[in-house]
Swiss-Prot record:
It comes from Hemicentrotus pulcherrimus. The lineage of its organism: Eukaryota, Metazoa, Echinodermata, Eleutherozoa, Echinozoa. Residues 1-20 form the signal peptide. Pfam families: Lectin_C. Keywords: Glycoprotein, Signal. It comes from the Eukaryota. This is 30 kDa spicule matrix protein. Spines and tube feet. Residues 93-163 form the C-type lectin domain. Matrix protein of the sea urchin embryo spicule. The function of the matrix proteins is to direct crystal growth in certain orientations and inhibit growth in others. Glycans are attached at residue 103.
Length: 288
């Protein structure tokens, strides 16, 4: 009997200790120094790095890849909970960037090199595919513009066709679709941009700011985008590859496409004029 009581006491103590390690499992004092919080990064004057804490420098910019989530406590007697675990709408995401660092906005992508850097940097950190807001959106004047105010000199729209500027539209990157293969299913994460209404869904985000003295101040006037894209591809008569009918593993052979990522670009469900119907056709239409 004594042995049973001893074991029971040990089990209860172990469960209590485990609960104490969980965020929000108790009030202040459970964690050394109180409950951890995720809030704006306060500039540290003693910091020697160019970018603020948690930000990464590439070229003349500092970037932050963020889920948009933060911790809050509804009441002193209630546990700490995570807000916005599914991300933020685009306008809220841009405001969030400004809270994370002065003068920061959703990222402005000015070149293919910058686009490819963001693709490789962010995708390496993803546990699962996650669409991400960038700063391109349709402003009050009905024109595509960046939240930073910089002119639109480069775009990388999926399909190489700029979508019609409609109020409320924004741009996201890293849209993903499942690609059916012979031995397993893989996910194609596109480095090209996809239009999405800013309040349709919540996404993660990439923020950007330029350290003082590294770039000229941006202008805030909306600009009419030239919609520059990569040079047009040569005309081809090849028909779309039906991947499940092809005996070869094409994804392992076709890597490093002109837009970054794979040379295989799956026709997205939302895109018109696709060679095969994603929902009705048992085979996925693949556009080499």
């Amino acid at each position: 009997m004594r042995c049973f009581v001893y074991v029971l006491v040990c089990v209860v103590a172990s469960v209590s200790y485990s609960r104490a390690q969980l965020p929000g499992a108790g009030g202040p004092g459970v964690f050394p120094g109180g409950v951890p919080t995720i809030g704006p990064v306060i500039p540290d004057p003693t910091r020697t790095e160019t970018c603020a804490k948690f930000w990464v420098q590439e070229g003349d910019s500092c970037y932050l890849f963020d889920s948009g989530a933060f911790l809050r406590q509804v009441a002193a007697s209630r546990p700490v909970v995570v807000n916005n675990q599914d991300g933020l709408f685009q306008a809220a995401a841009n405001m969030y960037c400004g809270q994370m660092h002065p003068n920061a906005t959703l990222v402005t992508v000015n070149s293919l090199a910058e686009n490819n850097f963001l693709y490789e940097w962010a995708v390496r950190m993803m546990v699962e595919p996650e669409p991400v807001w960038i700063g391109l959106h349709v402003g009050p004047a009905g024109l595509w513009q960046w939240y930073s105010g910089e002119p639109v000199t480069y775009t990388n729209w999926e399909g190489m066709v700029a979508p019609r500027a409609e109020l409320g539209l924004g741009a996201m990157i890293f849209d993903a679709d499942i690609i059916a293969q012979m031995f397993n299913n893989q996910v194609e994460i596109t480095p090209q941009w996809v239009p999405e209404h800013g309040r349709n869904d919540r996404h993660s985000l990439i923020c950007e700011y330029h350290p003082s003295g590294m770039t000229a101040a941006a202008t805030n006037a909306p600009t009419t985008p030239p919609m520059a894209t990569a040079p047009p591809m040569a005309a081809t008569t090849r028909s779309p590859v039906m991947f499940q009918n092809n005996p070869g593993n094409l994804v392992n052979r076709l890597t490093g496409g002109r837009f970054g990522g794979s040379l295989l670009h799956e026709i997205p469900r939302r895109q018109r004029m696709r060679p095969s119907n994603y929902r009705k056709n048992p085979y996925f239409g693949i556009q080499p």
